[in-house]
Amino acid sequence: MTNIRKTHPLLKIVNNAFIDLPAPSNISSWWNFGSLLGICLILQILTGLFLAMHYTADTTTAFSSVTHICRDVNYGWIIRYMHANGASMFFICLFMHVGRGLYYGSYTYMETWNIGVILLFATMATAFMGYVLPWGQMSFWGATVITNLLSAIPYIGTNLVEWIWGGFSVDKATLTRFFAFHFIFPFIIAALAMVHLLFLHETGSNNPTGISSDADKIPFHPYYTIKDILGALLLILALMILVLFSPDLLGDPDNYTPANPLNTPPHIKPEWYFLFAYAILRSIPNKLGGVLALVLSILILVLMPLLHTSKQRSMMFRPISQCLFWILVADLLTLTWIGGQPVEHPYIIIGQLASIMYFLLILVLMPMASTIENNLLKW
C-alpha cells in the first residue's frame, strides 16, 4: 500500500512541499531565511493574537491597555516584547532573504520574485500600522508624518490623506482602522507566502552556482528539515536574548510618552528597519520627489530581472559584481545610520550622497560591471 502521505489530498500537498521535494544538494545557510520568515510570521500572528485579547483600539485607552498588558496580564510583558522584537527579527530575515536573491540571481524566477516584492511591501505596511497601535508619541507623530506623505500626490493628495485618517487629523478613527488592518494583513501575507512557495516549486530552488541542479537533487527531508530546525533554534535564541536582556534596545524612548498632538518630538524617526528608506525620503528637498524616491527605493527590486546583463546567473564567479554588491550593502547600512540622525550638516550631504550611490549602483554600475565581466571571458 502506498504511504498515506502520498495519497491523502492534504498530506500530499505537505509531502510535495516539505518532505519528498527534490532540493539542490549544495544550497547554503542563505537558503534558510525562507523557512525562518515563515516561523517569524507564525510567531507574530500568535503573539499578536494574544495581545489583541487585551488591547483596546481607542485613543483614550490604547496606551493604558499596553501598560496593562505589561504590568497585569500573566506573561503579558514577554508576549509584548516578543511581538515588538519579533518584527525586528522578521525584517533582519527579510533583508537577508532579499540580499541572497540579489547575490545569487534568484530574481530570474520572475513570478516568485514579484510576489516576494509584494510581500515586502505588505510586511512594511503591516509593521508601520502596528507601530501606531501603542499610541505613544512616536506612534502618533510617525503616523502623522508618513500618512501626510500621500498629500504630495497631485490633485487627490489632500482628499486621500483625510480619507485614510477618517477626519482632519490622526485620531480615534485612524487608530481603529489601523488596528483592523494590522490584524488582517498578516493573514494576507500568509496567503501570499503560499503563492510565493507555489511559484517557487514550479521551478525548484536556485543554488549558489546559479547552474541547473537537476542532475544532483536530494530529498528535502531529512537533509533540509534538520537544517531548518537548526536555523529556527538560532533565530529563537537570538530573539529571546533580545527580549530577555534588552527588550527596548531597538525601540524609541519617546514611545513611552503617551501621544500628545500639541507637542512634537524633536526627532521623528521610524523603527530601525525603515531608516534606510526614510533617509532616501529626506535626502530630496522636494516633497513629491522624496515620496517617489521612497517608493522607488523598494520598487526598484521589480526591475532587477531587466537590469541583469550578465551571462552568468549567480555572482559566485563574478568578482567585480561581488565588490559592488557589498558596496551596496555598506551603502544601505550608511543610509540606515543617516535615517536615525538629525537633519543637519554633515548628515544631510552624507544622506544625499548615499541615496545617489544607491540608485547609481543598482541602475548603472552593476549592469556595467556584468557587461565587463562578460567580455573578460570567452563564451
From Swiss-Prot:
Mitochondrion recorded as keyword: yes
Membrane topology (UniProt): Multi-pass membrane protein
Cofactor(s), by name: heme b
PANTHER family in alphabetical order: CYTOCHROME B
Pfam families: Cytochrom_B_C (PF00032), Cytochrome_B (PF00033)
Name of the protein in question: Cytochrome b
Sorted UniProt keywords: Electron transport, Heme, Iron, Membrane, Metal-binding, Mitochondrion, Mitochondrion inner membrane, Respiratory chain, Transmembrane, Transmembrane helix, Transport, Ubiquinone
Task performed by this protein: Component of the ubiquinol-cytochrome c reductase complex (complex III or cytochrome b-c1 complex) that is part of the mitochondrial respiratory chain. The b-c1 complex mediates electron transfer from ubiquinol to cytochrome c. Contributes to the generation of a proton gradient across the mitochondrial membrane that is then used for ATP synthesis.
Note: Heme 1 (or BL or b562) is low-potential and absorbs at about 562 nm, and heme 2 (or BH or b566) is high-potential and absorbs at about 566 nm.
Ranges annotated as spanning the membrane: 33-53, 77-98, 113-133, 178-198, 226-246, 288-308, 320-340, 347-367
GO molecular function, one term: ubiquinol-cytochrome-c reductase activity
Disulfide feature: none
Cofactor: how and how many bound: Binds 2 heme b groups non-covalently.
Keyword DNA repair appears in the UniProt entry: no
Gene Ontology cellular-component terms listed: mitochondrial inner membrane; respiratory chain complex III
Superkingdom, taxonomy of origin: Eukaryota
A single BP term in Gene Ontology: mitochondrial electron transport, ubiquinol to cytochrome c
Quaternary structure and interacting proteins, as annotated: The cytochrome bc1 complex contains 11 subunits: 3 respiratory subunits (MT-CYB, CYC1 and UQCRFS1), 2 core proteins (UQCRC1 and UQCRC2) and 6 low-molecular weight proteins (UQCRH/QCR6, UQCRB/QCR7, UQCRQ/QCR8, UQCR10/QCR9, UQCR11/QCR10 and a cleavage product of UQCRFS1). This cytochrome bc1 complex then forms a dimer.
Family label: Belongs to the cytochrome b family.
Residues that hold a ubiquinone according to the record: H201
Binding locations of heme b b562: H83, H182
Primary localisation category: mitochondrion
SUPFAM superfamilies: a domain/subunit of cytochrome bc1 complex (Ubiquinol-cytochrome c reductase), Transmembrane di-heme cytochromes
Binding site for heme b b566: H97, H196
Cell compartment(s), UniProt: Mitochondrion inner membrane
